[in-house]
């Protein structure tokens, strides 16, 4: 299964509560935090919610 490298590139200050919750669920707490997650529909949904705050790359 593919994996996604998710990097937070913008601050969560001034965002809606559901966007802050999605960042926390992804494991991102501050700018330049990086997590690697499985490519699943649940993860894609959280990434879609905060796509303006993160950068996503596919890794092997």
Curated annotation (Swiss-Prot):
For this record, the Gene Ontology CC terms, alphabetical, are:
cytosolic large ribosomal subunit
Q: How does it assemble?
A: Part of the 50S ribosomal subunit.
For this protein, the record's PANTHER family field holds: LARGE RIBOSOMAL SUBUNIT PROTEIN UL30M, MITOCHONDRIAL RIBOSOMAL PROTEIN L30
Recorded hits in CDD domains, A to Z, give: Ribosomal_L30
NCBIfam families in UniProt? rpmD_bact
Which taxonomic lineage does the organism of this UniProt entry have? Answer: Bacteria, Bacillati, Actinomycetota, Actinomycetes, Micromonosporales
Known HAMAP family for this protein? Ribosomal_uL30_B
Q: Which GO terms describe its biological process?
A: translation
Q: Which family does it belong to?
A: Belongs to the universal ribosomal protein uL30 family.
This chain belongs to the protein called Large ribosomal subunit protein uL30
Q: Which cysteines are joined by disulfide bonds?
A: none
Native species of this protein? Answer: Salinispora tropica (strain ATCC BAA-916 / DSM 44818 / JCM 13857 / NBRC 105044 / CNB-440)
GO molecular-function annotation terms?
A: structural constituent of ribosome
**InterPro entries the UniProt entry points to:** Ribo_uL30_ferredoxin-like_sf, Ribosomal_uL30_bac-type, Ribosomal_uL30_ferredoxin-like
Superkingdom, taxonomy of origin: Bacteria
């Amino acid at each position: 299964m593919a994996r996604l490298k998710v990097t937070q590139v913008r601050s969560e200050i001034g965002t809606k509560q559901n966007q802050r919750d999605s960042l926390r669920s992804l494991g991102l707490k501050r700018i330049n935090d990086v997590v690697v997650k499985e490519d699943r529909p649940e993860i894609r949904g959280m990434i879609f919610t905060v796509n303006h705050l993160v950068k996503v790359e596919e890794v092997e």
